[in-house]
Structures are given as C-alpha cells and as structure tokens.
C-alpha cells in the first residue's frame, strides 16, 4: 500500500498520507473484518488490540483505551489508563490472511488520558529524537540488515534449535532448506509495500538475512517490527520457527542487525565529501565520534539480552572492540564502499534484532547529533584486523572494548546520563530495573555446561 518514488540514483518508498475518510473507504472496499491496533512495549515486543470494522469510528477518534499496567514497563496500576492513537499512514492489509474477511493493522502511539504522549512509549522516544534532528535541518535515514534463524519444530509444533541443513554463506537449494520459506517471506513483504534489496542464506546453518530499502528513521523502525512479525508468521506456515535470538546455537555465528545510517539536508547526503580521502564530511566524522563516545552506554539498548553478549565474542564476525574503519569488518563501525557519494553511510555493526528498534535508532541518532553539536573527533581509523592485534597493540592504539555481559552494559547505561536523558526518566528507570532483574535471574541458573564440566569432577 506504499508507493515508490523515483528520484536520483535511488528509488525510495514513501509513506501513505491517508485521511480518516480514506481509511473508512479502504476498509469497506477491501472487505476488512478485523483491524489490529499495534504498539511496541519497552522491550521491543509487538502488542496489539484487535477490533472489528464496526469499531473503526471509535478507533479513528482516538478512543480505544487499554490497561497500561498489564504491559511490562508501562504504567503503575493506579495510573494505568492509556489510549491508542493510530498512525493513519501505517494502514496495511495482511496478505497472508483470507481474502474474505481480511485483517489489517495500524501502528499506534500511546497517549495518556489528558491527551499527552506517554513518556514510556518507545515510538515517542524516537519521534522526539527525530524532531531534534529536524530542528537542526537533518533527516535521519536508516537501512537495517536483519538476520534470523529458521529452525525445525517438534511433534507438538514447539520451537527447537534443530536443523537438518548444513548450508553456509550464499548457498542455494537444495543445501538451503529454508529457501522456499525465505522466498515466501519476501513475496509477502513486497505485498505490504517493502522494497526488498536482497535475501540470502547467512554463515550459520539455518541462518538467513533479508535486507529492505533504507528510509526515514520512524518508518524504518515500524518496518523492522512489521518485518519480524511477517517472518515469524510465514515461517510457521512452513512448519518452521523463526527466531531473532542473537545466539541460539553454540559454535556458529550469531544474528545481528547492522544499522546503516546517513543524514540528509536539503535532499543531499551530508556524510559525503569527495575531497576527503575517506569520502567523509566533517559531520560524518563527528557523528562517528558521538556514537563512539556513548556506545558503552548504548549497549544495553542495542544488545538487550543476556544472550546478546554471547554473540559479541571473537571469532564469529561480530564486533568486540570500539573502533572504526573504511576497509575491514572487524571494528564496531564500518564505512561501506559507495558507488556514488549519495550512498555514503555509517554502518554500526553491534546491534542485534532482539533490540527495540525505536529505542535503538533514538540513541544512535542522539549520540551522533551530540557528536555534530560538540564536534567530537573520532579516534584514528583502524584498518588492520583488530582480532589479530595483541592486547598491548590494542592498548597502544587506545582501542577499548564493548561491555562483555548484560550486567556490564547496564552499569555503563547507569553511568551515561546523556543516554538516560534520551530515553527519559521513565524508560531509563524501568529499563535498568528490568535488565538488572534479568541478569540476576540468569546468574542463579545452572547451565548444561556446568553440569557437563563439574558434576563428574567434583
């Protein structure tokens, strides 16, 4: 339901500018029976309230109320009434549902009864950061690279980590057992207006990647949530379980969500400067500097799970060290080659797909903007394989490390008052408390590794 707009070297996807009357007409003409009002909780989980088409007038008048105290991290029971305000531009009809009695969705913002945006709504946090960029004359554009696994299910259709395939990077069928499911996912996403640039098998058995066209930050965050929902739904129809868990299997590559970022001003990519040896402008360098200053404090957002830090280890093409480069993939930040200056972008390689995309893009943008405002110079680029450097060599080059555990990441977030301010007091406090609880629950568990390692010996 989105339209492609051709301009320059790229074809971009534009948002729909639906009115209430358009929505009512489309729901009637398309025989839509149910409308899902979707929103995202603090931890990146998609939630929804389903209403019938007969309730559309109430929905479009922003009168759909729900109990915010039932959503983790939202509100206390004594102030729990919340309202869903649908973003009309996000209306989409699910292509995988029956053609009679169709199901559509609209993504919603969360508001308090007094008509004020709810400060605990992650979408509002990103909107606030985007507004700051717009006040500076910038448009923040983002292209994600979403990786996931397609695993078998058991006889009760419950998910497992089993797969019968041994396919690797760029392999095709019959080695790639998930090829049919991946193709079906792509076709359904295209029916929903996605522009799919590439899809392929990834490094690990049963691991896949689908890349869709860059867009403005809010639309991209919405698309990431839609993408994850569609991938899981279509995979299940193929008898598979799709997971965005960062490291579901030991000894193989984990799944990341690399974030490609650029800033536009007056329709031009301001990260590009043909006169610079690296093709980068001052703003691009400062943006890198801002992210590198705050990346430790951002880690609990970009890598939110205990399991996230089992991906961020040497040997599996995931970043561990805080550095940037134009020539290799071992650092945290890479500057991909661009055929023309308009494609110049900054690739942040640490985030994973378990992250809340609204909060992730908000902290990335805000850190980068602070870099521009304060003219934060990044350190010298590192064009060597950082994993091949000795500890002494890394110290001499002043190369720091990302947090090694969720606990370390939470402690870094507690120290970074700037990132806390970006999130807001409500989200920062609730998030830190929840992640500390998650860590303490994890550390009290007894793993299979411990049983195998210690039970016989001791």
Cite the ranges covered by each PLM segment.
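Core alpha/beta catalytic barrel or barrel-like domain that forms the active/cofactor pocket
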Residues: 141-152, 159-161, 192-212, 242-262, ...
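Active-site-proximal beta-alpha loop/turn segments in soluble metabolic enzymes
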Residues: 162-172, 205-220, 249-254, 266-271
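ATP/Mg2+-dependent ligation/transfer catalytic cores
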Residues: 1-198, 220, 240, 397-458
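A generic structural motif
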Residues: 41, 111-117, 174, 214-220, ...
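Flexible loop/turn segments at secondary-structure boundaries
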Residues: 42-47, 114-115, 150, 205, ...
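Short, contiguous, pocket-lining structural segments
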Residues: 173, 177-181, 198-204, 216-227, ...
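Broad gene-expression machinery/nucleic-acid interaction feature
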Residues: 34, 46, 103-107, 143-147, ...
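Catalytic-core signal marking the mid-to-C-terminal active-site face
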Residues: 3-4, 226, 233-236, 240-241, ...
């Amino acid at each position: 339901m989105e339209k492609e707009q051709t301009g320059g070297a790229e074809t971009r996807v534009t948002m729909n500018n639906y009115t209430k009357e358009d929505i009512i007409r489309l729901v009637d003409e398309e025989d839509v029976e149910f409308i899902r009002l979707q929103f995202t909780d603090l931890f990146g989980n998609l939630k929804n309230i389903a209403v019938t088409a007969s309730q559309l007038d109430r929905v479009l008048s922003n009168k759909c109320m729900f109990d915010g105290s039932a959503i983790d991290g939202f509100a206390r029971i004594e102030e729990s009434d919340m309202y869903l305000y649908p973003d009309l531009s996000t209306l989409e009809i699910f292509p995988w549902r029956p053609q009679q009695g169709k199901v559509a969705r609209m993504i919603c913002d969360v508001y308090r009864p007094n008509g004020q945006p709810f400060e605990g709504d992650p979408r509002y946090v990103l909107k606030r950061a985007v507004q700051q960029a717009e006040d500076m004359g910038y448009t923040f554009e983002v292209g994600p690279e979403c990786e996931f696994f397609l695993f078998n299910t058991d006889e009760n259709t419950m998910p497992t980590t089993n797969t019968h395939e041994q396919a690797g990077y760029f392999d095709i069928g019959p080695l790639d057992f998930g090829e049919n499911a991946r193709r079906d996912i792509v076709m359904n996403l295209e029916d929903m207006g996605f522009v799919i640039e590439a899809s392929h098998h990834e490094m690990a058995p049963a691991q896949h990647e689908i890349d869709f066209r860059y867009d403005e930050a809010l639309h991209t965050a919405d698309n990431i949530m839609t993408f994850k929902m569609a991938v899981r739904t279509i995979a299940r129809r193929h008898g598979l379980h799709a997971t965005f868990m960062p490291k579901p299997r030991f000894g193989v590559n984990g799944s990341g969500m690399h974030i490609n970022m650029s800033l536009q001003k007056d329709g031009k990519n301001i990260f590009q400067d043909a006169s610079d040896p690296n093709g980068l402008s001052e703003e691009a360098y400062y943006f890198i500097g801002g992210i590198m200053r705050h990346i430790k404090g951002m880690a609990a957002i970009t890598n939110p799970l205990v399991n996230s830090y089992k991906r961020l280890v040497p040997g599996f093409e995931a970043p561990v060290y805080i550095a940037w480069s134009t020539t290799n993939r071992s650092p945290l930040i890479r500057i991909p080659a661009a055929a023309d200056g308009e494609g110049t972008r900054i690739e942040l390689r640490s985030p994973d797909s378990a992250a809340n995309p609204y909060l992730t893009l908000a902290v990335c943008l805000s850190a980068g903007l602070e870099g521009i405002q304060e003219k934060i110079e990044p350190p010298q680029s590192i064009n060597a394989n950082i994993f091949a450097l000795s500890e002494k060599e890394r110290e001499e080059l002043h190369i720091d490390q990302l947090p090694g555990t969720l606990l370390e990441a939470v402690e870094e977030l507690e120290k970074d008052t700037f990132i806390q301010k970006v999130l807001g007091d409500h989200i920062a406090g609730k998030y830190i408390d929840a992640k500390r609880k998650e860590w303490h629950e994890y550390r009290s568990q007894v793993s299979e590794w411990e049983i195998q390692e210690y039970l016989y010996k001791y």
